[in-house]
Regions:
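A detector of single, family-specific signature residues
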Residues: 27-28, 158, 297
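N-terminal pre-Walker A segment at the start of P-loop NTPase domains
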Residues: 10-34, 174, 181-217, 373-383
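A cross-family "folded-core" feature that marks the main globular domain of proteins
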Residues: 45, 72-75, 155, 162-203, ...
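An accessory alpha-helical subdomain
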Residues: 134-190, 315-318, 322-367
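Glycine-rich phosphate-binding P-loop
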Residues: 41-61, 222-247, 384
Length: 384
């Protein structure tokens, strides 16, 4: 993307949105670590209202984009319109909030220089918050709502296992292997690269208080797309795992997008060096070909015994209904958790001086953008 400045065309950076955390059927899940590979300077926002943290990140991202740098926008599963962080790969820098760090990365590795950012200091004055007793009740209710959501997701996973079992029993594994071999050959041919491939683990989408959210259109923009159709248990994730492993073996950088419901499953693989994306295109991230180069891989037609849907229709109906009910209930609990968190944070959020946040964010952006420019490594004041 280009824009004009004083008659000169300037290339604007590209923003890539995704999730690295998720509310999953296996509990809270964090995939941030791979996004920090190669990062040597990280600003970490200490506890502060989520909206204030996200506002600072948006400004930093915009400054980087205007400086022709690509950015990764890490969205929050608690509210997908807010950010967990922003990464500027070309500058080997990032700005995240402390809560996005997985526990095993606290403290950060020694090769990542860290600066603590205290947004709560940029306040215009104190606001009356919840009384201590009310605050304790709200915190307990928040924890209960999140816990209820995870219980519902776990119940949905048990139901989903029954759903998968029907199709696994009707599957031709020989046919699935033929499909995998065919698409390995089609995507990679005889090609390889003389380097070690990089694997980035992310989430394709996330269960949020607003429902299931994904960024498939943004992530696959400009790529040749293979849309995998099928059923639960029809081999979609297995095919994607095979393609990811093959890409890495051949030295390609591979983006591996995990299922936001079950992080042990894979929903999308992108190999940008080949201009290719292959993804599970079934609900809740169901898409249909809308680009001239889009192609469908139908695992049901290719690998499952004909008539399986019809043969098991009576068995499938209550499974599908029970799964949908559990997922809907889980989303309701997430929405309640968001409402409670907003109430808890509201007084502190109202006390934040957003103009000071904006001014400080531009300064932080300038520091982050200097790092890695022309090989320089910056060391801002206050480096921890």
């Amino acid at each position: 993307v280009t824009f004009a400045r004083k008659g000169v065309l300037i290339m604007r950076g590209t923003a890539t949105p995704f999730f690295v955390r998720g509310h999953t059927a296996r509990g809270p899940w964090n995939l941030l670590e791979s996004s920090l590979m190669g990062i040597d300077l990280l600003y970490v926002a200490q506890p502060a209202p989520a909206a204030a943290q996200s506002a600072a990140m948006r400004i930093i991202a915009e400054e980087a984009l205007s400086a022709s740098c690509d950015v990764w926008l890490l969205h929050r599963p608690e509210d997908h319109e807010l950010l967990d962080g922003v990464i500027i790969p070309s500058r080997k820098t990032g700005f995240i909030h402390e809560g996005a760090l997985p526990l095993h990365m606290r403290p950060l590795p020694a090769d990542i220089r860290c600066k603590a950012i205290h947004l709560s200091q940029l306040a215009s004055g104190s606001k009356n918050g919840l009384a201590s007793g009310d605050l304790s009740v709200a915190e307990d209710s928040f924890q209960e709502s999140e816990g209820n959501a995870y219980n519902c997701f776990a119940r949905a996973l048990d139901i989903h296992d029954d759903w998968e079992a029907i199709y696994i029993s009707a599957m031709s594994f020989e046919a699935a292997n033929r499909v995998a071999n065919a698409y390995v050959s089609r995507l990679f041919g005889e090609t390889s690269l003389p380097k070690e491939g990089r694997r980035d683990d992310r989430f394709l989408g996330a269960a949020t208080p607003a429902g299931a959210v994904d960024f498939v259109p943004e992530l696959t923009r400009g790529l040749k797309r293979y849309l995998i159709k099928g059923r639960a248990g029809s081999g979609k994730s297995t095919l994607l795992k095979r393609l990811a492993a093959e890409g890495l073996r051949r030295g390609y950088d591979v983006e591996v997008y995990h299922c936001g419901f079950d992080p042990n499953s894979i929903d999308m693989v992108i190999v940008r060096e080949l201009g290719t994306a292959v993804f599970d295109s079934t609900a809740p991230h169901e898409y249909f070909p809308d680009r001239e180069t889009d192609e469908i891989i139908d695992m049901y037609d290719l690998c499952i015994a004909p008539g399986t849907d019809e043969l098991h229709a009576d068995q499938l109906a209550p499974i599908q209904s029970g799964y949908a009910s559990a997922m809907k209930e889980a989303i309701g609990h997430l929405a309640e958790a968001k409402r409670l968190r907003n109430a808890i944070e509201q007084p502190a959020a109202e006390a934040v001086n957003m103009q000071e946040i904006a001014d400080a964010a531009r300064d932080w952006a300038a520091e982050l953008l200097r790092n890695g420019a022309n090989g320089l490594r910056t060391a801002p004041d206050g480096m921890a």
